[in-house]
């Protein structure tokens, strides 16, 4: 058997389908928790759930918000939503998980940042908020150096998921050599938790880019 999971995302139907698949394939317990982390009420509900789960071993902050518009032309509040999802939610959920982890002197937190954290060319708000996730992770690990808790900033590059399509980005012309599968990125991230390196950039192409 594997590790029991609490799955958080906006779409209940997708969550329930994923939970059923994971339960059947790996014989793990799954709980779905539909929430939009850009909404205060939902974010606070997730934080309470985390705080009420003292046996939590691993928190993965992987909620993403993509955008490609120019900052000075943003009239839809995309910048505010990006800050809410990448900065505010990451901070609040990490704090919610830490109390129990500190008491047990064990646990791990993976903040999914991006190679965009190293680049000024990936959009003003996207690069900036991803840079926050990177620096937050690095400084937090320093703060927790003797706590038994590991903090990782995972900085993937182009990864085959729905993210780019949902963000309205057509990257079909980008050669396959620049892409990685989500499974490959996950394997590298979890393997890295055996050590103590905070910033993890998966893939040789991505390492060159940073």
PLM segments and residue spans:
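Conserved glycine-rich Rossmann-like NAD(P)H-binding loop of the short-chain dehydrogenase/reductase
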Residues: 3-17
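Rossmann-fold cofactor-recognition segment
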Residues: 24-39
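Conserved NAD(P)H cofactor-binding loop of Rossmann-fold oxidoreductase domains
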Residues: 62-67
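Substrate-binding pocket helix/loop in short-chain dehydrogenase/reductase
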Residues: 70-83
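Active-site helix of classical SDR
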Residues: 94, 129
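Residue(s) in the substrate-gating loop at a strand-loop-helix junction
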Residues: 114
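SDR active-site lid
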Residues: 141-205
């Amino acid at each position: 058997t594997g590790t029991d999971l609490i799955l958080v995302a906006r779409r209940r139907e997708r969550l329930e389908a994923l939970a059923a698949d994971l339960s059947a394939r790996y014989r793990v317990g799954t709980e779905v928790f539909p929430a939009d982390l850009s909404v205060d009420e939902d974010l606070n509900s997730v934080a309470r759930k985390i705080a009420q789960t003292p046996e939590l071993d691993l928190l993965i902050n992987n909620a993403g918000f993509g955008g490609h518009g120019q900052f000075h032309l943003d009239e839809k509040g995309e910048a505010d939503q990006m800050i809410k999802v990448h900065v505010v939610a990451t901070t609040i959920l990490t704090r919610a998980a830490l109390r129990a982890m500190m008491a047990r002197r064990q646990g791990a937190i993976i903040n999914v940042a991006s190679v965009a954290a190293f680049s000024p060319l990936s959009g003003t708000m996207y690069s900036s908020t991803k840079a926050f996730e990177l620096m937050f992770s690095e400084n937090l690990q320093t703060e927790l150096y003797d706590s038994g808790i590991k903090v990782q900033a995972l900085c993937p590059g182009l990864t085959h998921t729905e993210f780019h399509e949902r963000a309205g980005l057509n990257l079909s012309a980008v050669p396959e050599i620049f892409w990685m599968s989500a499974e490959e990125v996950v394997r590298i991230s979890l393997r890295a938790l055996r050590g103590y390196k905070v910033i993890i950039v998966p893939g040789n192409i991505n390492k060159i880019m940073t």
